[in-house]
Amino acid sequence: MDIKGAIFDMDGTLLDTEPIYDLAAQKVIDEFGNGQKITWDVKQHVVGTSSKIHCKIFVDAYNIRLTPEEFEKKRDEYLIEPFKSCKFMKGAKETPHKCKYEYNLKVGIATSSSKFNFENKTSHIKEWLKENIDKIVTGDDRRIKKGKPAPDIFILAAKELGLEPQNCVIFEDALSGINAAISSGAKCVVAIPDPRQRKDIENIKYDKNRTKLIILNSMDEFDISLIN
């Protein structure tokens, strides 16, 4: 495969932010909703989506007495401090470095997060970003017409790297993001899913002659030989 670039999702792929989002959303639900706890039945439709979709799903599911925009603003207030200490997922600190310096790939990030939230959650890893990441595309970029599961963000990230998606490997954890990566035309998609979504990902229908889908338990299992 003629792979020249690697594109990484952020939440749940590079950084372990999903529990932070859950806690912040739960605080808003407790304050303005019906007191229910977030369940996987709802959360599975939220993982990997844009913040706008994410918030609308929660508002509708838990009868929140706020608009989606108000929910987002309140939730984001609860995210600021925890983001400052969020950790890398297993193998996620090393893999982009390896892609850039050992495999000689251009490396990008494509995240559904807004620029504001991206900067908050990466404030403590600025040097790592500078060293390992060539381009970053956030979910509120005006050039993105549709969020995941539409492929727009990955197509744009590849373009920012000066590449076509078919020359990229894309790393994702969420079903919506994996579908977006496949739809972009990427030659290879590396999925590191929540175990609860693994079955759904294994059952994705796609053109196996166009895209190779690799499913791993954690990113430290990745090696370029898996693509070839």
Predicted regions and their residues:
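Non-catalytic, surface-exposed connector residues within folded enzymatic/regulatory domains
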Residues: 37, 69, 86, 112, ...
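Conserved phosphate-coupling serine/threonine residues in phosphotransfer and NTP-handling enzymes
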Residues: 13, 111-113
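Proline-centered flexible-loop/turn and helix-kink motifs
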Residues: 103-104, 127
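N-terminal helical cap/lid subdomain that shapes the substrate entry/recognition surface
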Residues: 2-103, 119
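Asp-based, Mg2+/Mn2+-dependent phosphohydrolase catalytic module
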Residues: 1-4, 114-228
